[in-house]
Amino acid sequence: VGFDPDMMKCFEEYLSDEEGVTYKLEMKKMDFDNIITQLQGDQIDVGISGFTYDSKRKVEWSDPYLGSSQVAVIPKDSDIASTADLEGKSLVAQTGATGEAAAKEVKDAKVTGLKNVQDIMNALSANQYDAAIVDLGVAKNYVKSDEFKMLDESLMDEQNYIIAKKGNTDMIEKMNTCIKKFLASDDYAKLCKKY
């Protein structure tokens, strides 16, 4: 559930229309830090999980498809009111993701990385941390419950990309064609409103 999986369902339709072949999307849930390994091992064709550009990652990069930011999610009853209040607090973020990098920029914060968002939010719910640093789209999903709220300020602004195995430029060209079509479509506007 989320922006990325819903967008990929649109891509499935776009690819089928464009190539006259019926594409069937198969989504695999995995830890963020395993996605590139799965790409390199030909276990998956593309990775889509809020990837931000990093030249150290040896993959093919699509055009950006979504602007986003890293934000702090806190328990509803927290007295944290701004990003400045995160100083010296215990923060949790996804290992290897930009949220972890953003958390490490907070002065004197004690930062822990966990493998997936569900573990992060469960730990926050259990009051093991003062705040979770996550992607804005993820945060919006979790603050729908009465359990959490989100700080208004972002810690980091970014662009999201789709990745493919290094050398798989054909797949990236297909993704870029879909991204262009998506960004010009009503589908994009609907998903932005939804998430």
Where are these regions (language model features)?
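Extended ligand-binding regions for polar small-molecule ligands
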Residues: 5-14, 97, 161-195
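Beta->alpha turn/N-cap motifs
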Residues: 28-33, 42-54, 76, 94-98, ...
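Short helix-initiation/N-cap motifs at beta->coil->alpha
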Residues: 22-37, 78, 112-126, 158
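Flexible hinge/capping segments at coil-to-helix
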Residues: 74-91
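Extracytoplasmic small-molecule ligand-binding "clamshell" domains
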Residues: 1-49
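Periplasmic-binding protein-like
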Residues: 66-74, 136, 140-180
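Ligand-binding clefts/hinges and TM-proximal coupling segments of bilobed small-molecule sensing domains
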Residues: 23, 101-119, 147-154, 179-195
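A ligand-binding cleft/hinge motif common to bilobed small-molecule-binding domains
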Residues: 34, 48-59, 102, 125-157
